[in-house]
Amino acid sequence: MSHLDQVIDQEKPDRRIVVAALGVTQILAWGSTFYLLGVLANEIARNTGWSYDWVTSGVSVGLLMAGVVSPRVGRAISKWGGRLTLAVSAVLLAAGLLLLGSCQSIAWYLVAWLLLGAGMGSGLTDAAFSTLGSIYGENARGPITSLTLFAGFASTVCWPLSAYLIEHLGWRGACFIYAAIQIGFALPILLLALPRGPSVPPPTADDEGARSRASLASGELPIFALLAVVLTLSAAIFSMVGIHLLPLLQARGLELSAAVGLGAIVGPSQVGARIVEMLIGRHYHPIWTMISSAVLVAAGTALLFAAFPTYSAAIVLYGAGNGLGSVARGTLALALFGSSRYPVLMGHLALPILMSMALSPFLASIAFQVKGATLTLGLIAFLGATNVLLVGLLWILCRRRPTAAEID
């Protein structure tokens, strides 16, 4: 073992500490950005007189900005590790929340979301996955799967917290408290728990297989492009269902309380599927996790479209598939392209994923308003079925690689 390897091994922290630190900070980051307006939007619109549509567009603005910065974030994590990048994210989120809480016009409100978007792009799921890849290399699959368990509790933790803060401090006070949490709690945790640099040694100049961390061989380009399409389509389905599930169920004749009860099934279904993956996933290639995810999501959305007598079965299937999809999003690229290129490639994959999450709810909203719930659910089911075919093609391409034996 070289001196560099010894230093890296000594500085590599306990996986449980790193995953716990990232898990807690991911809950806070998601809860103070993507899930923030789920509770604050109505209060902001009522208090300011701004259009509700303009208020809720803040998340889309943030996701678009996150997509723009994500490729640079991947390169930064590849070069310097995730500690500095995630710390910068906490500072950006705090600054964005401070501006959000003090803004007096819709223009400054959207500027605040641009700042929050920069923090989202440098600190949410893909950045956290890339950080784990830079620390643990080829052994990052287990930590990535464990981290996804935490993410499923972001709304569970932060929606009640946001509601409590609004009741006692108002929406502006809630933003200020979340800003303080980012600086006073999340930032120190990240600085203390994460190593100073990547634990995966950088490629040397004479390493022909690593001339560039982002380079792809000609045979890898179709696989990477198809993986990007699959993940983007998966993100579109997730965003459409996540935003419109309750209104779609109500349009099908369900009462609000019944729709909310069904929607609550998604979270436990996601976590349950991730626990199963954590227990048995190491025994098979991540492409099978992706296949399982696509099939379950397609089955769930098809049953929703068909008005299956038991909606709960459809939502359990969808939730389980979505939960596995989050794991596959973090582990499949690692398995296909290796750890040295992983942070950079994850940054490039995050760009279309985040753009899709920002724009697809608008498309679903237009379909819902113009053609109604049945056509909208049909569109989502069609996308789910299409993704199964694309994942099947991805499996075929992966099997043709020289290392395809491990996929069987």
Regions found by a protein language model. Give the residues of each.
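Helix-to-loop junctions at the C-terminal end of transmembrane segments
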Residues: 69-81, 273-285, 368
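Helix-loop-helix hairpin linking two adjacent transmembrane segments in secondary transporters
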Residues: 150-197
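Hydrophobic core of transmembrane alpha-helices in multi-pass small-molecule transporters
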Residues: 27, 107-123, 232, 311-324
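C-terminal ends and interior cores of transmembrane alpha-helices
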Residues: 91-104, 296-307
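Extracytoplasmic
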Residues: 18-52, 70-73, 159, 241-246
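Extracytoplasmic gate region of multi-pass secondary transporters
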Residues: 37-41, 220-272, 278
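C-terminal transmembrane helical hairpin of 12-TM major facilitator-type secondary transporters
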Residues: 266, 270, 283-332
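Intracellular juxtamembrane helix-capping segments at the cytosolic ends
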Residues: 122-136, 324-337
